[in-house]
């Protein structure tokens, strides 16, 4: 399967990269991108690896999730299967009230 990255997913990853760049420096920020991409490629090979999120909102109902590879395994990638592709929808740190956060625009407080 091929991987498509939605605009919100790209914005989430860029925002997290910028956070690591500011807080921890270039080396850590640059190291963040490899595990994210490796996780996307793993899901392309094994699309059913991530379980469904169990969300009730219609937009999120079919979304699946999977943890980013170590050492960034506090980050969750949300995706869905669509027309033979994996569509990466969001990327964020695991936290409470995920359904609400997933429906917000990237960077919303």
Regions found by a protein language model. Give the residues of each.
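Enriched for short, Lys/Arg-rich terminal
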Residues: 69-109
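Generic structural signal for secondary-structure transition and capping sites
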Residues: 18, 41, 45-49, 71, ...
